[in-house]
C-alpha cells in the first residue's frame, strides 16, 4: 500500500475503482483518470477488485504510472477488476475501507459503476467524518493523517450496460451492449426469414427497458416488452400474436419479439421470455425459437462511442476532483448533449429510487416520465413501427403527398431514416413518394409511391436504396424540378443527405418567387459520414463510419506492434476533422492532423524526433491519424516517406488510406436510433408547416442533446464558403483531451525536469 504524503508538502492522490458489473469502456475511463491525474501533477492509484479491494487494502491499492494504462483502451472488461461486495454493505466494511484510504493518503476517489456502487460511494462520503473519529479513537490511523484528510471527495462515473443511471444521457457500456444485441438480432433475422420463423430474444437491463426498447427500434422488431410500460390489457398474448400474424399476412417472412429481462404485466407479475415463446407457439401454431443473449452483451471490445465517452468523463472527473473545495458534495459526471456535466450524486440516486418506487407501485406513467423525454418518444415511435398495418386516416386531418430524396455521399442510416419517415407518414394518413437517384431524380421525374411494405427490412440496411449522388443543382434545373413537383402533386419534401441536399433545399427556397411549386414544407435531415453540416452536433452515418475506422485501426495496430512500426492512417471527412479527431481519441493515437489546425514541416520534424526517442526506449508502435484534406502538399504518402526516411534504423513506417470502407456496412445502433428519431420529428414538422399559408424550410439536428429546427435561410451564413464546413464545430473543444491522453508522459514530469 502507498504511504501517505507528508502534510507539509502534500501531493493530491486520486484513486479509481471499477465496481459492480463490468461494462465495455471501463478501461478507457481508468486510462483517462490515471493520465489526467498524472498530467495535472497528482498521483494516481488504482483500487483493484472494486469496493472489495477498498476493504482489503494492501496490494489491492497500487500506484499507477503513465505506462500502466498503455494499450488498454480497446480492451473489454476492466483490467483492475471488479466485484460486488457484500461486506461493503456493512458499517464495519466501510470502516475498513476508510482506514485503507486514509493510510494510502487518498481523499479523492473516482468510482466507475452502476447504481449500487454509486449508492455505496455516497454512503461512504456521508459516514466519513464519523468513521474518521472512530478510527482516531481506536488508534487505527495516526492523528496527523486524519487531520490532513477531513473530507472525502467523490466523482461517480456511470458504468452500466443497463443505462439505468439518472444524470446522464447514456452510461458507459450501453452503446457497446446495443452493438452486441443489434448484431445478434441482425444475424438471427437472416435465418428467421429463410425459414419464415418467429424468434424471441431476451436482453439484459434488469428493471430498465432501455436495451430492449432501443434494440427493437434499431432492428425493426415486431414486438417489444419492457418493464416501464407493460401491456395495458390482460390478453396481451393474443394481441401480440395477432400483430405478428397480420405481419406475415402482408408479406413479412419473419417475426422478432424482444423481451427485457425485467418485463412484467400490468399487475407487476414477471413476463419471462419462455412464457412469450409458449404464448406464440399456442396462438400462432408454429415452432418458435428462443435466444437468451446473456453475457455476450457485456463482453467484447468497447464501441468507438464508449471509448470516447469514457475518456471524456474520466478526464472531467479528475478535473473536478482536483478543483474540489471543502464542502464539495459527491457528483455524478455524466454526458448531456455531448458535453460532460456534473450533477449532485444524491439527486441521481434519489431519481433512481423514485423510478423503482413508481414501478413497484404500478405507476408506470410516472416511471416513463422519470426515464426522460427521449425514452418516451422512442417508445411511441416503436409502437407505430411495430404495427403490421397503419392506422386508418383520421377524419378531418389533412393528408399530404410527401416526397423523400437521398442526396450526397452514401451514409449508413439513410435507409433507416427513409423507413421511419415512410411508416410514420403513412400511419398519419399521408402519401409517401420516393425519388430515385438523388436530385437528378427530381429533375427527371423519377418518382414512385412508397408503401408500408416498400421499406420492410430497411431498418438495418446500409447504403441508400433510393439511390444518391453529389450533384449540385444548376440554374436550369429548377424549372424541370418544378414540372416534376406539379406532375406528382408534391406537397412537401424531405431531403436526407449531406451538403448537396442542403444546397438543393436552399436553392428551392430561393426559387419560390419564380416557381410556386416550391412553396411547400422543405426539411433536411443530416446524413453524411463527414459530420460537416450546420445545426446538428452529429450527422447520421458518422457513428457508423467512426466504428468502421476504429475496427480497422485496431487491426492495423496489432499488425504494426509486431514489427515496431509507425502507421500513418488517412481517414475521410473532407475539410472537417471530426472523424480524424474522434478516431484518434478512440484508438489511442499519438498524433492527429486536422485541416482546422493546419500542418507544417516543423511540426512533422518534431513528431519524427519524438517517435524516434520513444522507439529507442522500447516503444513498439506509433499511430498517426490524418484527415484526408489536412494539407494538400504534405499528403499521406509524403508523411509516410518522411517518417520512413528519418526513422531508418529505428522504426519502419507504413501508411493506410482507409477509403470507402468508412461509408459501408450496416448502420450502428446509434445511427439507426437517431435516424428514426429525427425522421419522426421531421414528419411532425412537415405536417405543422403544411397548415401554414407560407410553409417554412428548415434543417433538423441534435444540438446539446435537443432536437432543433434551424431556418433554411441561415444555411449559407452558418457555413464556411471555402471549406464547406460549419463555422462553429463543438468537437474541437475535445482536442486538448485527446492530446493529453496521447502524450509520451505527463507534462508535470516534463516541467519538473526543466
Question: Where does each model-flagged region fall?
Answer:
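Glycine-rich oxoanion-binding loops at beta->alpha junctions
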Residues: 2-7, 54-109, 118, 161, ...
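N-terminal phosphate-binding or glycine-rich loops at protein starts, especially the Walker A/P-loop
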Residues: 2-58, 396-443
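Short, ordered loop/turn segments at secondary-structure junctions
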Residues: 19-22, 47-53, 84-85, 114-116, ...
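Short glycine/serine/threonine-rich phosphate/pyrophosphate-binding segments
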Residues: 23-33, 54-55, 89-95, 115-122, ...
Amino acid at each position: 500500500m502507498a504511504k501517505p504524503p507528508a502534510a507539509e508538502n502534500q501531493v493530491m492522490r486520486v484513486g479509481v475503482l471499477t465496481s459492480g458489473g463490468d461494462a465495455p469502456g471501463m478501461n478507457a475511463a481508468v486510462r483517462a483518470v490515471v493520465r489526467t491525474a498524472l498530467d495535472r501533477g497528482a498521483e494516481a492509484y488504482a483500487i483493484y477488485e472494486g469496493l472489495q479491494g477498498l476493504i482489503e487494502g494492501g496490494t489491492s491499492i497500487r500506484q499507477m504510472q503513465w505506462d500502466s494504462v498503455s494499450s488498454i483502451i480497446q480492451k473489454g472488461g476492466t483490467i483492475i477488476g471488479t466485484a460486488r461486495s457484500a461486506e461493503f454493505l456493512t458499517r464495519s466494511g466501510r470502516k475498513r475501507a476508510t482506514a485503507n484510504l486514509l493510510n494510502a493518503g487518498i481523499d479523492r476517489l473516482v468510482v466507475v459503476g452502476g447504481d449500487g456502487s454509486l449508492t455505496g460511494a455516497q454512503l461512504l462520503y456521508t459516514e466519513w467524518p464519523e468513521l474518521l473519529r472512530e478510527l482516531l479513537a481506536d488508534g487505527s490511523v495516526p492523528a496527523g493523517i486524519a487531520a490532513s484528510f477531513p473530507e472525502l471527495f467523490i466523482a461517480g462515473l456511470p458504468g452500466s450496460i443497463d443505462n439505468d443511471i439518472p444524470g446522464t444521457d447514456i452510461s458507459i457500456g450501453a452503446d457497446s451492449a446495443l452493438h452486441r444485441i443489434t448484431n445478434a438480432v441482425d444475424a438471427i433475422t437472416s435465418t428467421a426469414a429463410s425459414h419464415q420463423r418467429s424468434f424471441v430474444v431476451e436482453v439484459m437491463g434488469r428493471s430498465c427497458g432501455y436495451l430492449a426498447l432501443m434494440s427493437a427500434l434499431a432492428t425493426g422488431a415486431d414486438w417489444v416488452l419492457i418493464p416501464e410500460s407493460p401491456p395495458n390489457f390482460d390478453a396481451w398474448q393474443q394481441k401480440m400474436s395477432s400483430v405478428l400474424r397480420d405481419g406475415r399476412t402482408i408479406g413479412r417472412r419473419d417475426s422478432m419479439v424482444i423481451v427485457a429481462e425485467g418485463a412484467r404485466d400490468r399487475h407487476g407479475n414477471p413476463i419471462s421470455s419462455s412464457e412469450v415463446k409458449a404464448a406464440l407457439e399456442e396462438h400462432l401454431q408454429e415452432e418458435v425459437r428462443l435466444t437468451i443473449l446473456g453475457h455476450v452483451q457485456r463482453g467484447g471490445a468497447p464501441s468507438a462511442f464508449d471509448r470516447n465517452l469514457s475518456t471524456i468523463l474520466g478526464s472531467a472527473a479528475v478535473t473536478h476532483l482536483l478543483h474540489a473545495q471543502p464542502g464539495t458534495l459527491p457528483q455524478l459526471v455524466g454526458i448531456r448533449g455531448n458535453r460532460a456535466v456534473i450533477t449532485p450524486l444524491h439527486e441521481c440516486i434519489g431519481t433512481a429510487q423514485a423510478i423503482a418506487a413508481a414501478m413497484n407501485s404500478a405507476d408506470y406513467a410516472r416511471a416513463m416520465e422519470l426515464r426522460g423525454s427521449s425514452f418516451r418518444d422512442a417508445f411511441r415511435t416503436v409502437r407505430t413501427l411495430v404495427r403490421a398495418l397503419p392506422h386508418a386516416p383520421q377524419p378531418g386531418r389533412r393528408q399530404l403527398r410527401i416526397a423523400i430524396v437521398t442526396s450526397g455521399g452514401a451514409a449508413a442510416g439513410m435507409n433507416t431514416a427513409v423507413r421511419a419517415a415512410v411508416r410514420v407518414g403513412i400511419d398519419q394518413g399521408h402519401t409517401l413518394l420516393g425519388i430515385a437517384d438523388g436530385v437528378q431524380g427530381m429533375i427527371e421525374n423519377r418518382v414512385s409511391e412508397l408503401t408500408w411494405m416498400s421499406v420492410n427490412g430497411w431498418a438495418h440496411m446500409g447504403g441508400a436504396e433510393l439511390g444518391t449522388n453529389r450533384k449540385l443543382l444548376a440554374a436550369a434545373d429548377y424549372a424541370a424540378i418544378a414540372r416534376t413537383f406539379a406532375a406528382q402533386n408534391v406537397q412537401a419534401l424531405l431531403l436526407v443527405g449531406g451538403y448537396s441536399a442542403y444546397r438543393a433545399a436552399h436553392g428551392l427556397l430561393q426559387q419560390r418567387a419564380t416557381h410556386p411549386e416550391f412553396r411547400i414544407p422543405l426539411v433536411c435531415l443530416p446524413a453524411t459520414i463527414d459530420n460537416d453540416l450546420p445545426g446538428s452536433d452529429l450527422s447520421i452515418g458518422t457513428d457508423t463510419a467512426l466504428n468502421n475506422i476504429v475496427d480497422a485501426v485496431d487491426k492495423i495496430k496489432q499488425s504494426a506492434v509486431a514489427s515496431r512500426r509507425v502507421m500513418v492512417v488517412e481517414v475521410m471527412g473532407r475539410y472537417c476533422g471530426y472523424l480524424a479527431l474522434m478516431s484518434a481519441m478512440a484508438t489511442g493515437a499519438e498524433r492527429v492532423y486536422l485541416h482546422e489546425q493546419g500542418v507544417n514541416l516543423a511540426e512533422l520534424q518534431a513528431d519524427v524526433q519524438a517517435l524516434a526517442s520513444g522507439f529507442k526506449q522500447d516503444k513498439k508502435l506509433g499511430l498517426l491519424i490524418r484527415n484526408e484534406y489536412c494539407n494538400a502538399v504534405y499528403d499521406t504518402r509524403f508523411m509516410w516517406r518522411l517518417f520512413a526516411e528519418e526513422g531508418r534504423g529505428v522504426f519502419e513506417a507504413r501508411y493506410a488510406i482507409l477509403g470507402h470502407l468508412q461509408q459501408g456496412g450496416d448502420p450502428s445502433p446509434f445511427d439507426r436510433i437517431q435516424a428514426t428519431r429525427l425522421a419522426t420529428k421531421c414528419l411532425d414538422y412537415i405536417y405543422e408547416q403544411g397548415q401554414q399559408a407560407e410553409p417554412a424550410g428548415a434543417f433538423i439536428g441534435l444540438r446539446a442533446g435537443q432536437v432543433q429546427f434551424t431556418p433554411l435561410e441561415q444555411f449559407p451564413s452558418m457555413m464556411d464558403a471555402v471549406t464547406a464546413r460549419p463555422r462553429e464545430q463543438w468537437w474541437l473543444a475535445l482536442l486538448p483531451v485527446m492530446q493529453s491522453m496521447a502524450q509520451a508522459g505527463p507534462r508535470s514530469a516534463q516541467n519538473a525536469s526543466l
